[in-house]
Every structure is written in structure tokens, then in C-alpha cells.
């Protein structure tokens, strides 16, 4: 298994509720449809506006393909910018 670790800057999104609604109604359902998706976790942004997600995929290839859609500098929704996107092998799970 491999995971995509993504960090976003949400400081351009003035209404956190709009961002949360888009996350729940668009981003998460779309992630579930990506090839090889196994699980995903999206963490609320900190006070500095940085949000983090971890999406787990069955293969490195599927994780890399998903990460390409969330490249640094891209904007998954208005007011949100990807600042970090990494693919890593999963070392352990519980």
C-alpha cells in the first residue's frame, strides 16, 4: 500500500463552512472513485489555514496517479491551494 500525503492552504477560503461542505460533498466522493482508493482522512485546518489529508491506495502507481491530480500549486477548489503532495509507502497500519 502507498499513501498520498497532501497539505493545503485554505487561507484564501473566507468561509470555512463552504470549504467543509465542498470537502464532504465533492472532494471526498471524488477521491472514493479514484482507482485503487482504500481509505482517506481529511483533517480540519489549523488556525494558520493549513489542512492535511492522507489517502491510501492499493499500489504505488495508483497513489502516484492520484497525487498528480493534486500537484503543488494546484487548486482543488476556490481559495484552496496545494502546498505539499507526497507519495509514501505505508510501513504499518492498525
Predicted segments, located by residue:
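Short S/T/G/P-rich N-terminal loop/turn motif that feeds into the first structured element of a domain
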Residues: 1-51, 58-69, 78-94
Amino acid at each position: 500500500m502507498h499513501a498520498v500525503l497532501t497539505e493545503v492552504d485554505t487561507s484564501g477560503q473566507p468561509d470555512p463552512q463552504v470549504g467543509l461542505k465542498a470537502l464532504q460533498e465533492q472532494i471526498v466522493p471524488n477521491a472514493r472513485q479514484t482507482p485503487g482508493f482504500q481509505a482517506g482522512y481529511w483533517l480540519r485546518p489549523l488556525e494558520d489555514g493549513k489542512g492535511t489529508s492522507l489517502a491510501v491506495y492499493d499500489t504505488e502507481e495508483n497513489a502516484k496517479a492520484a497525487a498528480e491530480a493534486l500537484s503543488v500549486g494546484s487548486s482543488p477548489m476556490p481559495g484552496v491551494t496545494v502546498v505539499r503532495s507526497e507519495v509514501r509507502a505505508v510501513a504499518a497500519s492498525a
